[in-house]
């Protein structure tokens, strides 16, 4: 029915042809779908939903397939609905700092589209060059800047969603009643198909600097995270890496990470020049016990320091093509103990 209703180029069938869609970034679990459909417009999405409903076929929505939770993994005999071709930036409202997007727009493409207006989109997952905004909403993605600027849920103003019946719903932050907009964020495609996203944009900061601090122990590095927050600083980005991650990222990206460090902390500060300098003075005092301290001296150097961290996932993939990666949530007060325990288990 799908082949009859839609032109051949957007329906993929056959075991070998659908292999690329049998998993997302969580590659330890795999399941081939019955077929994959790559619609080119919303009407085709509605057609697919109608046909699948009539035939009682499960539908699994897919963005770019970079997620790490298995959210885009097909069910047995399911139809994968890939939305990568719906990739238009529909409108940009500079005055109100909003952008209306189709779900297949890549995360990094949002900031590229509004850069000329001095704006950008804050959430920046490590897969931002490939991941889609629809997938970001489905996974409630974060990124290195989520500490200060929030997750996807904090940066989405409205959604247009299709139910399995093909009904179109508009969910907005301005709606009264139940928080359905927030509910859709992180729902992994289970509650509806996201066909349009309105995101908020923020002004590019006057200045941004990254402090790179190397430590002789994971515990000292983890304690530094808590100390920075305790000092009243909310960094634009705050990320730590252990020795294995440092070696993997440096081998892949070659950005100048110190390979003799047991742990590395990247702390980004942004704002006006005066704000950044004041916060930088405080952070450097907090990090005075680090074995190495370096502050980015240019925008290119700042981006390079983050490039290494954002390369960690593909870097480890180069060492082991099949590995298990999940996000964990650890209270800051337990971070040092948890990381030391993980290192102990790794040695075993």
Please describe what each predicted stretch is.
Residues 13-19, 203, 209-348:
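C-terminal substrate-recognition/cap domain of FAD-linked oxidoreductases
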Residues 1-50, 67-97, 126, 243-254, ...:
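N-terminal flexible segment immediately upstream of the FAD-binding catalytic core
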Residues 51, 153, 257-261:
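Acidic/histidine-enriched ion/cofactor-binding microenvironments in catalytic or ligand-binding pockets
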Residues 14, 62, 82-84, 124, ...:
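Generic beta-strand/beta-sheet core signal
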Residues 88-241:
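FAD-binding subdomain of flavoenzyme oxidoreductases
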Residues 31-59, 98, 192, 198, ...:
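Soluble FAD-dependent oxygen oxidases
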Residues 1, 38, 42-45, 103, ...:
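Generic structural signal for well-ordered, non-membrane alpha-helical segments
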């Amino acid at each position: 029915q799908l082949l009859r209703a839609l032109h051949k180029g957007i329906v993929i069938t056959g075991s070998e042809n659908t292999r690329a869609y049998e998993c997302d970034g969580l590659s330890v679990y795999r399941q081939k779908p019955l077929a994959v459909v790559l619609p080119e417009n919303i009407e085709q999405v509605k057609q697919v939903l109608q046909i699948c409903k009539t035939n009682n076929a499960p539908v699994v929505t897919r963005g770019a397939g970079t997620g790490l939770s298995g959210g885009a993994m097909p069910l047995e005999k399911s139809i994968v609905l890939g939305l990568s071709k719906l990739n238009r930036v529909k409108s940009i409202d500079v005055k109100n700092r909003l952008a209306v997007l189709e779900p297949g727009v890549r995360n990094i493409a949002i900031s590229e589209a509004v850069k000329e207006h001095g704006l950008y989109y804050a959430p920046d997952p490590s897969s931002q060059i490939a991941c889609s905004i629809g997938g970001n909403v489905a996974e409630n993605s974060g990124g290195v800047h989520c500490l200060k600027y929030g997750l996807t849920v904090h940066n989405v103003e409205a959604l247009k969603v299709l139910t399995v019946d093909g009904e179109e719903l508009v969910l907005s932050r301005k709606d009264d009643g139940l928080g359905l907009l927030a509910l859709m964020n992180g729902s992994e495609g289970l509650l509806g198909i996201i066909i349009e996203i309105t995101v908020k944009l923020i002004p590019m900061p006057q200045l941004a600097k990254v402090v790179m601090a190397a430590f002789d122990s994971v515990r000292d590095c983890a304690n530094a995270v808590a100390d920075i927050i305790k000092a009243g600083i909310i960094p634009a980005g705050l990320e730590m890496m252990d020795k294995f991650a440092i070696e993997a990222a440096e081998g892949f990206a070659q950005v100048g990470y110190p390979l003799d460090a047991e742990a590395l902390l990247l702390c980004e500060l942004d704002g006006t020049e005066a704000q950044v300098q004041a916060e930088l003075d405080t952070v450097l005092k907090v990090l005075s016990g680090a074995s190495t301290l370096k502050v980015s001296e240019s925008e290119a150097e700042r981006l390079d320091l983050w490039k290494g961290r954002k390369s960690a996932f593909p870097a480890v993939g180069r060492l082991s093509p099949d590995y298990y990666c999940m996000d964990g949530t650890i209270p800051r007060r337990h971070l040092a103990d948890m990381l030391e325990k993980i290192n102990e288990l790794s040695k075993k």
